[in-house]
Amino acid sequence: MNSFFVFEPTGSTTLFSSLHLMWLWNTLFLCIWSGHMARRGHCAARAAALLLLLAEFFRVLTLFICGRLDTGFLPFHLCGAAVYVCLFHEARGGQLAGELIYSTLAPGALTALLFPDWLHYPAGSFLFLSSFGIHMLICAYAAAMLCCGLFHPSPQRLPLCSIILSLYGLAVYALDRLLRVNYLFLLFPAADSPLEWAAAVLPWHGLLYFPALSLVWSTLYFPPVLRLIQKGVPDPARLR
């Protein structure tokens, strides 16, 4: 408990250690449970969205009270934006918001869980716990959204998603240069991540985003995958 309010990188958790793997197993369990509850007609997506709202509010409040809230903790990373897109989707619905979550934001959250940049904080610290918790909830929301029957992935919406992501990336790059921050890891790669490995062989590590996103989309929109999703999702009319 003494390390809860430690904000300095003094942790020693390593990538894919037993502790890291435990969090990944917890994420898998939470996603399966959320999808199962949503398929049975329960409000799993709404619960995940409300927990995301509370977690983000508590994160900002804690950082503010501790005097640590600065330009480096604004919600401009992909997963920071995902919190608000999930909240918007739960409140207003919309297939485009759902498509962004399914195609990009949830895979981004999963990638962050696989290669977290917060492992250098103490394992019991606020930043360590809240970072895992928020990313897990984004994945859980996506699972519930997908299994409740109210959203159906469509590759026809990907061109518009690409435009939105490109504009967002350009805006964040300008913000990074202006505030001297590193949102979306555009200026330099996160430690112990594929971006850092790409920096050793590519002229700019950000070039990895393009083949990575192409691979993700090829998998998520592979026709057998879409048919499997469609087969496993209940008819929304039966849930009313």
Please state what every model-predicted region is.
Residues 35-46, 91-99, 148-158:
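Membrane-interface helix-boundary motifs at transmembrane edges
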Residues 22-34, 80-91, 134-148, 206-224:
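Hydrophobic cores of alpha-helical transmembrane segments in multi-pass inner/ER membrane proteins
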Residues 51, 100-109, 159-168:
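Central hydrophobic cores of alpha-helical transmembrane segments
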Residues 5-26, 161-167, 179-218:
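Membrane-interface transmembrane-helix boundary segments in multi-pass integral membrane proteins
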Residues 18-25, 67-79, 100-102:
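Structural signature of hydrophobic alpha-helical transmembrane segments
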